[in-house]
Amino acid sequence: MIPDCRSGDGKGGGRTIQKYQIIYADPPWDYQQCRLSGSAKKHYPTMRIEELCALPVAEIADRDCALFLWATFPQLPEALRLIQAWGFVYKTVAFVWLKQNRKALTWFYGLGFWTRRNAEICLLATKGHPKRQSAGIHQLVISPVERHSKKPNEVREKIVALMGDVPRIELFARQQTPGWDVWGNEVENSTALLKEG
């Protein structure tokens, strides 16, 4: 399924594609090449890189658009491939989430592959020339882990502070968020879904 971000009469007539200046995505990465391949699949359906690349995200990106893409370090090559497939150019790491335990606020450590992992990164890529609205947004996010793979809510706030209150969508969303259109299999979508084929 892919986002159908069109507005109109709902019957196919007079419809235009909704364009977004911010796209925030936390893809359900499939770790087929890794020994922990079943870990994510225990919690939610995953997608192969080919399936992710086939999503028509470029169609919903405005002329000037910022993409914020969560990636894990083992999936970094796939994340960079996905950025390009969606029509964006990699710029930097926007946010580094340093994970804490929920109760004790000590550092949380996952299993990792070579070293015990703690951090997760959100990459920033652009299409066109989106403008930064604030120079005071910090890269570090120190926040407790929640349910599997759920990202800190404050990241959305940082994105809006950085880029402004512009049309925005969260792909693979896990919750409704005021001011954001959402699309994903864990939320009631604010956009219609269009099936391929």
Could you say what each language-model-derived stretch is?
Residues M1-G197:
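Class I S-adenosyl-L-methionine-dependent methyltransferase catalytic core
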